[in-house]
Amino acid sequence: MSSYRLGYCMKEERHNLVLCLWSQSPGILNSKCLWPFTNIHLLVGALPREGAGGAWGGGRSEQLPTCSTTHHDFTWDKKVVNPLFEKRPKNFGIGQDIQPKRDLTRFVKWPRYIRLQRQRAILYKRLKVPPAINQFTQVLDRQTATQLLKLAHKYRPETKQEKKQRLLARAEKKAAGKGDVPTKRPPVLRAGVNTVTTLVENKKAQLVVIAHDVDPIELVVFLPALCRKMGVPYCILKGKARLCRLVHRKTCTTVAFTQVNSEDKGALAKLVEAIRTNYNDRYDEIRRHWGGNVLGPKSVARIAKLEKAKAKELATKLG
């Protein structure tokens, strides 16, 4: 099989520049480095393999051919076009060719729940949101939230299956004649607005955790003020789904710690201290901050255009 010596020249019309690159490998034809270049003239010559002393035998190196840089030394082959193939340019006007694929996300008719949550998010930005509702945007930081959920995971209430197994084991023990000794109820999380409200009013809750995305928000809008009045530390956690997983429910708005084991009292005290600093002690500051009142890009552009016209008119009057 004969080896190929490949040389290709690229000429730039304006600067009369010729780039010459020589290679002994035919694989250079498929090299991606050639793709960006246009007007490349390929010169491929089949040269017979030389002996042991030739250019490929490791002996003396043969002088490679050179490519002249003058304009008239080589000719450029014109692209051969078959006249039988006619050009049929597409017309994307109305009622003409099929339109190309475009991103039509803006025109999709989304499901009702998606439209509602998007409209709600826009309204919360456009309208002036009172402080009582705006306070639910100030959620617990990620590090403290992780520690809180880690502690709360230890005090998850039992599931239906666990309760069934516990009662079954107790019934079997009683049937065997070993006696029925009532056990003390372990400390667990208490969930639900009514339950937590009662615990706060009786000052039995040690820490109250409220979800930030309760819908309707009126269900829990009074809880921060009640907790502050009764001196109970409270915090606002991002995502009611995280609370739902803790207490094995489909929906959950708030949970409360009532009791913890002796080994976890130190961790709970640290959490309560950090949460009290961020929420209870800052209540007067939080209730003064309104939210929303952020205009959209169209309104901002319209106002800027009017201001520019007013400034131009004033400059004309002042002369």
Swiss-Prot record:
GO CC annotation terms, alphabetical: cytoplasm; ribonucleoprotein complex; ribosome
Cross-link (Glycyl lysine isopeptide (Lys-Gly) (interchain with G-Cter in SUMO2)): K101, K150, K178, K298
Domain of life where this protein originates: Eukaryota
Subcellular location: Cytoplasm
GO MF assignments: RNA binding
Pfam families: Ribosomal_L7Ae
Main location, first listed in the record: cytoplasm
Keywords for the protein's UniProt record, in alphabetical order: Acetylation, Cytoplasm, Isopeptide bond, Ribonucleoprotein, Ribosomal protein, Ubl conjugation
Protein family according to the UniProt entry: Belongs to the eukaryotic ribosomal protein eL8 family.
Assembly mode: Component of the large ribosomal subunit. Interacts with CRY1. Interacts with DICER1, AGO2, TARBP2, MOV10 and EIF6; they form a large RNA-induced silencing complex (RISC).
Function noted in UniProt: Component of the large ribosomal subunit. The ribosome is a large ribonucleoprotein complex responsible for the synthesis of proteins in the cell.
Name under which the protein is recorded: Large ribosomal subunit protein eL8
Organism: Oryctolagus cuniculus (Rabbit)
